[in-house]
Every structure is written in C-alpha cells, then in structure tokens.
C-alpha cells in the first residue's frame, strides 16, 4: 500500500464511521421515546393481604386447572420484585403460571423511618408467616411451596426451619447461605475487619438505596459504568435491545431503602459470623435449626453470579437432613437467572418440572430422593434418568390422612386384640420413654445417629457425656451440650 492509497483508505474509513455515527445519533431520538414508554410488572394480579408496607399479590391463573400446592415467592428486601415479571417473554411469574401453578408474591414495599427498628425476627416470624397462613387458608393446603430469591431465599430458609410443617417444598434462587470464604467480593468487603454495619445504620437509620446501588455497581465498575453504555450505543438502532436495556435500567434505578436493624442483623449474623450455616442463628428467641429442614430443597444458582457465587449456596445442601435435594445451575449471572433468554429457555422449565413433581397431593408416590445436580444449558451432561412426562404427585402432608380409617371392630369383652396387648407391656408404675425428637434441635437424622450409639430416650441422653457423644456422631459439642441440658431439665 502506497502512502497515497493509505491516506485515501484512512479517509474512507473516517467518512464511513462518521456516517454510522450520524445514523445512530438520528436513531437515538427515536429510541428516547421507546425508553420512556417501556412497562414492567404487567402480569395481572390482585392484592389479597396488606400489612404495614407489605402487599401480598395473587396472580391471575393462565391455565384451566392448577397444581394443588401453590407457590409463594419471597423476594429480597432490596430492589423491587418486578425483576421476576420484567417482560412477558422473560417473566418467572408468567412461566410458573403457564405451567399451571397458583402463584403468590410478597412485595415488601419501602420501609419508612418508623420501620428502622424492624428486625429479621419481624420479617421472618411475623410478615412471612402471616403471608404463608393467608396462602394456606386460600388454597386449603396445610403446607405450601416457597421460592425465595437472593436475600428472600436466605429468609425462606430461616422460615422453613422455624415452621417446617407449613413448607412442603423449598426453592432457593441465588440464596446466600454459606459464608466461609465462599461469598466472593461481598463477603470480603463485608468482613468485620473492614466494615461495620452498625456504623452505617447509626449514620443513616434505614440504609439508603443509593448507598446500596453504588456498592453493587462498584463490584464490576467497568461493566456497570462503561461497557453497558457502549453496548447500548452499538445497538441503538435495535428497538428490541433498547427496550430490554430500558427495562433493566428502570429496575436498577428503582431501589428501596432497607430497615436499619434488619440490615445490621443480616450482615453481622449471616455474612460476618456465618451463624445460619453453623446452625447458631436465633430468631424471636428460637434456634433456626437446620435439622428441621427435611422437606425437598432445590437450589437454583448462576455459574457467573458475582453477587452470590454458587459456592455460597450449593454447600448448604450438605448441612440439612433432607433426602431430596437438587441443584440446577445455569450459565448466567445473578440477575440473568430471572431475565436472560437462556434461563427461560432451559432453566425455568427444569425448575417448573421439579415443583410439578412435588405439588400434587393425595397419593403416596414421591420423586426419587437422591441428591443430584443438573445443568439445564446446552453443555449439561445427559443422565440416564429423566423425569416421566406429566405430573408426579407427592405424598400427602404428614398431618393429612392418606387413606380412610378402618371401621372399628367390636371385640368381645373376654377377647383382646393384638394391638391392645402392646401398650400393656408397660407396668402400671412405669411410663413409656420420652422420644428424643421432643428435644429442640433433634430431628430424625440426629435421633438416628444417637440411636446408633445406644441413646434412644431422653433419660439416656441426660446421662450421656456431651464430648464423647459429639466426637462419635460428628456434631459440635455445644449442640450436644444443649441437648443434654434440655434432657436433664426434663428428667430432674
């Protein structure tokens, strides 16, 4: 290339770029109208319950029949919940409705200065519990499905551990649960060496949404302050792209404050001290005992989630006694779990199938209870086991009668049935041993472990050595000591 042709080629490219700039700039004015007209959260719903700022939404059904067990979505206390109903073709709410579910959602609203002293105790044991009871009453079900997103997933775990009889299946979407050098940037920034939640709440009261927004944006500053706007300019002539971009920006800028005491409690107890994963968290004077989580549990995680890395979620399944746990991992990020086209093409159909298999009542059939991990993207490994088409009903709740009671049979006065002989084995001056599961913190799993070392009653537990038992059944000494103290109090 000669100097002349080089100069001419350079000039040609400059003119082409200038022309392209003019075209994009011209389109920008047209797209400004598009930005101002986008709408979000348009799936029809009605408010069926209100308390303080909270609204419980019930969505209009999309199918003639619905599954017996409804789904209550518990959203985070940060940002608005319409990220789950951002647009019709990328709406978690719509997807669940179209699959035949009866869907409810908690919209927390925004706390006022009067709500500064609300705690996790209030949100979990009062607000969520009241909403669950409303859904139970309306559906006629003793237990319902919970689907918690982000912080809402963490609170759903707390609730399910405190009220396991009310939760049939537990879905956790990008839920921060285990913070043992597994929580990524947020855990590092929030380390008590460098960060004091109390100092923030002392200064602000409620934590301002602007404060939270800047913190989240700084986790990926190049993407949030440069790259996404370059991408917008490059696609400004694409109306669909601009609409999607505008909806996301509307949601990102529509933040809400967080009640001060709740923020402080959540950061200190869950992030900094990892109390939830260590089974040491207390709410409303009660232990949030992970040993009570025996219901089916589904973890929905994003492979590229920089807010809640998969490592802060997946290990939780090893901390609970549930024999029916599963992980569905999508090749996306934190927000992409709810709005990306890939998630709605692969991930949410798999999630819907999981709930469907466990949301019919009235039979004894249950899905296979093996712990498994699936990846619903195109690179997922295929397995030999695939769920049968259609619905797989779950066994009836424990407090429901599956079969009719047999008619009582008349027994002659001089005859004794076999069933009547059994309780007579206890002498008149003896009482049957008290069940181990009556001790707070002991569920079927721990009861089985204790039985393996010869402890089958409360009196036997009261006489046990906590250190020896803890080492044998692989349970913290502090937990066994608490059990022994409870048992001793009952046998004194």
UniProtKB/Swiss-Prot annotation:
InterPro entries: AB_hydrolase_1, AB_hydrolase_fold, DNA_repair_Rad51/TF_NusA_a-hlx, PHA/PHB_synthase, PHA_synth_III_C
Gene3D superfamilies: 5' to 3' exonuclease, C-terminal subdomain, alpha/beta hydrolase
All residue ranges annotated as the AB hydrolase-1 domain in the record: 70-336
Top EC class of this enzyme: transferase
Highest taxon above the source species: Archaea
Matching Pfam families: Abhydrolase_1, HHH_5
Recorded metabolic or biological pathway in which this protein acts: Biopolymer metabolism; poly-(R)-3-hydroxybutanoate biosynthesis
Practical uses of the protein: PHB and PHBV are desirable bioplastic due to their biodegradability, biocompatibility, and mechanical properties. However, PHBV has better mechanical properties than PHB.
Region of interest called Disordered, as start-end residue ranges on this chain: 359-443
Disrupted gene: phenotype observed: Depletion of both phaC and phaE genes leads to complete loss of PHA synthase activity and PHBV production.
EC number in record: 2.3.1.-
Keyword field: Acyltransferase, PHA biosynthesis, PHB biosynthesis, Plasmid, Transferase
GO molecular function, one term: acyltransferase activity
Active site: 150 (charge relay system), 305 (charge relay system), 334 (charge relay system)
GO biological process, one term: poly(3-hydroxyalkanoate) biosynthetic process
Reported function: Involved in the production of polyhydroxyalkonic acids (PHAs), which are water-insoluble biopolymers used as intracellular energy reserve material when cells grow under conditions of nutrient limitation. PHAs are composed primarily of 3-hydroxybutyric acid (3HB) and 3-hydroxyvaleric acid (3HV). Required for the production of poly-beta-hydroxybutyrate (PHB) and poly(beta-hydroxybutyrate-co-beta-hydroxyvalerate) (PHBV).
Listed NCBIfam families: PHA_synth_III_C
Subunit-structure text: Heterodimer with PhaE.
UniProt-listed PANTHER family: POLY(3-HYDROXYALKANOATE) POLYMERASE SUBUNIT PHAC (PTHR36837:SF2)
Sequence similarity: Belongs to the PHA/PHB synthase family.
Protein name: Poly(3-hydroxyalkanoate) polymerase subunit PhaC
Gene encoding the protein: phaC
